[in-house]
């Protein structure tokens, strides 16, 4: 993988290449991603999803509050921006041509990580992982089984193992209301967002949590592969059939979430 590809400013529907040197320095291309996410309906809906309900120290205290997914996402994005800028400085020192030839600065790295971190929970259903399991059970051994015959094995597996990360990719990229490509985020930001760049099948027999998760639904596979190709993500040697190695900045998004 190379950073020129990994930092792609391309957006769905683009007909010409976006160059970093041509970007407006007062509002970086990757900062536009952050703005589009924070003003989106799916992000605003996170205010109704609980991240943590703290035990009250004092029942009558005005300082008691519910920590929502929206608040959590804002906090993670702030940490992610700092991590991205710090790591970005080191990357530019090792690869100075990214700045001298292409015009990238350490702020670009911070902006990518901040935007991806802001969206990291955007696809989570109500009740988080419990909600994912409830949806999965509905299709695995509930009334949802009636739809199995109308789907491919992979399509049905997407529902049996319903995954918030895949749903997030769908929300960010799905064409609706006449808007092609959803939020039309840069491919660099989408790459950093994709924690699990693989499909729901084949399933790898493993106890490792990452092997049980996936990053896209079958309905979004063609665009997922377009992003992968643009970024130059490499096939995962441990899952050659349907998986790719992560975008390096994804690790910073995950670190910010810990």
Predicted stretch roles:
Residues 50-64:
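A short small-residue
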């Amino acid at each position: 993988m190379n950073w020129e590809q990994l930092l792609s400013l391309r957006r769905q529907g683009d007909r010409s290449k976006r160059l970093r040197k041509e970007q407006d320095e007062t509002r970086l291309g990757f900062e536009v991603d952050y703005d589009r996410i924070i003003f989106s309906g799916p992000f605003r809906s996170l205010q109704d999803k609980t991240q943590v309900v703290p035990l009250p120290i004092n029942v009558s205290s005005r300082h008691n509050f519910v920590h929502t997914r929206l608040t959590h996402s804002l906090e993670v994005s702030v940490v992610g921006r700092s991590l991205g800028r710090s790591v970005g400085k080191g990357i530019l020192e090792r690869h100075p041509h990214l700045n001298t030839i292409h015009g990238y600065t350490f702020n670009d790295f911070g902006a990518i990580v901040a935007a991806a971190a802001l969206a990291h929970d955007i696809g989570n259903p109500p009740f988080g992982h419990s909600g994912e399991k409830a949806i999965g059970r509905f299709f695995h051994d509930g009334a949802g089984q009636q739809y199995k015959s109308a789907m491919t094995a992979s399509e049905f597996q997407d529902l049996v193992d319903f995954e918030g990360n895949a749903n997030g990719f769908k929300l960010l990229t799905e064409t609706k209301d006449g808007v092609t490509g959803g939020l039309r985020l840069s491919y660099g930001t989408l790459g950093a967002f994709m924690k699990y760049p693989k499909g729901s099948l084949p399933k790898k027999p493993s106890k490792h949590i990452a092997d049980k998760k996936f990053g896209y639904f079958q309905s979004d596979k063609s665009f997922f592969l377009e992003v992968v190709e643009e970024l130059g993500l490499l096939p995962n040697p441990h899952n050659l059939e349907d998986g790719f190695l992560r975008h390096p900045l994804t690790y910073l998004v995950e670190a910010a979430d810990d």
